[in-house]
Design a protein with these regions (language model features):
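Blade-edge beta-strand/turn elements of extracellular beta-propeller
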Residues: 90, 141-156, 197-208, 238-243, ...
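Cap/lid segment of the alpha/beta-hydrolase catalytic domain
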Residues: 98-115, 126-131, 145, 150-152, ...
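Solenoidal tandem-repeat scaffolds enriched in leucines and small polar residues
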Residues: 164, 169-239
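Long hydrophobic segments that form regular secondary structure
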Residues: 205-271, 280-284, 580-582, 587-613, ...
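Active-site-proximal cap/loop segments of hydrolase catalytic domains
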Residues: 456-654
Length: 654
């Protein structure tokens, strides 16, 4: 039975909601035999020839690994010489499968914070079912056991927690300690200093309307850095209690004796989106004579080694990485593989001048490169493709949106034939940049079968600096859909596909994109995949972490912003099939998603069904906001989605 009282769907684990979700999910899966595709995807995800990405801590390189025998994963380590050898010998530190079985818990590994310098203790984060909320437990790397709380071991109950080591017996912690300790978004509002065996002492308190408060301890300079996130794009920072007097919309990064800034609007001669640096002491004494390190390209990310700053930039969505010597600011451009996107995957001031870079493209598998003090890169590992890439190429096109803005998109496939089924991704929010990247899953299930894949760079992302994002927030949010529609129309105009051959797909904010497209311009495509979406935008700020996103979407309690949101909120713009026929939609979510509430997906699927529109629904019982918690779940969900797309817009050419 599809019909249900919508309010019942707000309760994550209530019997009526779970029964409704399970029955509809089972019906969706039953219509599609995904076993063969699932098996092939799972084999690629579990393959031993994948690259084990590493992080250096002292003399060891650490890695977390999942495969067919270890579905929940192994936390392990090795030496550099062994890692670079043809066959690597790994030392297992924690077997999460064994732990979950021993404790009868649905544990998902969420990371480890290891005690700097000695590297013999860790604060392990474990999630039930993949949720953002974690339990934190102290782990002894020498005995390979958790430290008993009765013996002074640090243990923090399940919550959205952040932690940082100060020394062997002291940590900084922000967690849910009850009323008055978390923000309206559900994140820590306080930071406390906790000494082993003693009580916590609060050192900083934010405000309920903040997104979060966090702190870290710099073991090199022996100082505490506290950050108060006012919203998603504004924050304030204190170093050992001293406020850094920069604008709220300016990212401030204190490092060693310098202060690096990335302003979203011009500040002290540093242009919006640029990168500036000044002596930290001089700044605190009133100096504002910044040195501009980068202003000609979009700064995508920063990373530090012992003696250098690594700057990753984008120019027309093409990657460059520079190594800049600290203090002299002498710059060396890294030589990256041709036609590849690259990003720094590991670097640390505590790991000398070593750093690691991953490079790939839509058609070229990932290469892992090791860098040194000279900026030279040496190949360490190279992953093979698990699908046939012959005949595939990528093109970049530019289109004009409704307000005249030009934006690019990539299209990948075999261009030797005519129009064919085309899958269009997209995100368009939160300053997230979409760059070319290799995916065995997409290759196996789509590209190898003859389909085109389109990746648009919509406004709202970070590909072209702060203004590329700020142009489409709050009352201008509709422009994201104008960009998306322009891309779909261009794909058709260039002869790549007819509208009925196009499927759109997006998750999270991308699920808002595709659900909004479904109700705004359904004539432009033939199917929509809507994953872990936001759809109920008139009350999103009251669900899970929704209050933290009001700087992006607007405040539904503000009359002007509410009026704007109401024009595009997907749930509130569903129309009956007698008025307009929507293409088929597949709506997916996870019961354990504690970031975007499953009610967004549940109520939207219900609204489509009640309107007589074609809709399928699938809810994974685990997985958190990622939608899947292990390779078995990923292969299950991905196979279902791709077979559903094939069923709706036609199987690509063999």
């Amino acid at each position: 039975m599809r019909d249900i009282e919508p309010k019942l769907l707000d309760d994550l684990t209530a019997a009526p909601a779970l029964k409704w979700a399970r029955e509809w999910s089972d019906a969706t899966e039953a219509r599609l035999d995904s076993s063969a595709l699932r098996k092939r995807i799972r084999a690629a995800l579990d393959s031993d020839d994948r690259i084990p990405f590493v992080t250096r801590r002292g003399e060891y390189l650490y890695n977390f690994w999942r495969d067919a025998e270890h579905e929940r994963g192994l936390w392990r380590r090795t030496t550099l010489s062994s890692f670079l050898a043809e066959h690597t010998d790994w030392e297992t530190l924690l077997d999460v499968d064994a732990l979950a079985e021993d404790e009868d818990e649905d544990w998902v590994y969420k990371g480890a914070t290891v005690l700097p310098l000695s590297w013999d203790r860790a604060l392990i984060r474990l999630s039930r079912g993949g949720a953002d909320a974690v339990m934190v437990r102290e782990f002894d790397l020498e005995t390979r056991t958790f430290v008993d709380p009765a013996e002074g071991g640090f243990t923090i109950d399940e919550a959205k927690t952040n932690v940082s080591w100060v020394d062997r017996d002291t940590i900084l912690v922000g967690t849910d300690e009850g009323p008055g300790t978390v923000t309206n978004s559900g994140y820590p509002m306080q930071v406390a200093r906790w000494t082993r065996g003693g009580d916590k002492s609060v050192i900083f308190t934010g405000e309920p309307d903040d997104v979060a408060v966090g702190a870290g301890y710099d073991v090199v300079d022996r100082r505490t850095v506290v950050t108060r996130a006012l919203d998603f794009y504004t924050s304030r920072t204190w170093v050992d209690g001293e406020f850094l007097d920069v604008p709220d919309d300016c990212d401030a990064i204190p490092h060693r004796k310098w202060l690096f800034i990335q302003p979203r609007t011009e500040f002290a001669g540093v242009p919006a989106g640029a990168l500036g640096v000044i002596g930290l002491d001089a700044f605190q004494q009133g100096a504002r004579d910044f040195t501009v390190l980068e202003q000609d390209a979009t700064v995508e990310s920063l990373a530090f080694t012992e003696n250098a700053l690594l700057i990753t930039c984008l120019v027309d969505v093409a990657t460059s990485i520079s190594r800049v010597a600290l203090g002299t600011w002498e710059r060396t451009e890294l030589t990256l593989p041709a036609a590849a996107s690259a990003h720094v995957v590991a670097a640390s001031p505590l790991a000398g001048d070593e750093f690691w870079v991953a490079a790939s493209s839509f058609t070229t598998p990932t290469t892992l490169l090791r860098g040194d003090a000279s900026g030279a890169l040496t190949e360490a590992k190279h992953a093979p493709a698990h699908f046939d890439t012959s005949g595939l190429e990528t093109r970049q096109h530019w289109v004009t949106s409704a307000d005249g803005t030009r934006l690019p998109y990539f299209i990948t496939g075999d261009f030797s034939g005519g129009p064919r089924p085309t899958l269009v991704g997209g995100y368009g929010g939160f300053e997230v940049s979409l760059t070319p990247a290799f995916s065995n899953v997409r290759g196996i299930a789509w590209l190898e079968q003859g389909g085109f894949y389109v990746q648009p760079n919509l406004r709202g992302g970070g590909e072209f600096g702060p203004e590329w994002h700020s142009q489409v927030v709050k009352t201008n949010r509709h422009k994201v859909w104008e960009d998306h529609k322009a891309v779909l129309e261009d794909v058709v105009a260039r002869g790549y596909a007819a509208p009925a051959q196009i499927a759109i797909r997006g998750g999270s904010n991308g699920g808002l994109l595709t659900s909004g497209a479904l109700v705004q311009y359904p004539e432009c495509f033939g199917a929509a995949v809507i994953q872990v979406p936001l759809t109920d935008m008139l009350r999103y700020h009251t669900l899970s972490a929704g209050a933290s996103w009001m700087a992006e979407y607007g405040d539904p309690d503000n009359p002007e912003e509410r009026a704007a949101i109401a024009t595009w909120s997907p749930l509130h713009n569903v129309r009956p099939r007698e008025e307009v026929a929507y293409p088929p939609a597949l709506v997916t979510t996870s019961t354990r998603d504690d970031r975007v509430h499953p009610a967004h997906a549940r109520t939207f699927a219900l609204a489509l069904w009640r309107a007589g529109q074609p809709v399928d629904y699938f809810e994974n019982t685990a997985g958190g906001h990622a939608g899947a918690a292990d390779n078995a779940q990923v292969s299950r969900v991905e196979a279902l989605i791709y077979l559903w797309i094939n069923d709706k817009i036609g199987t690509p050419l063999a």
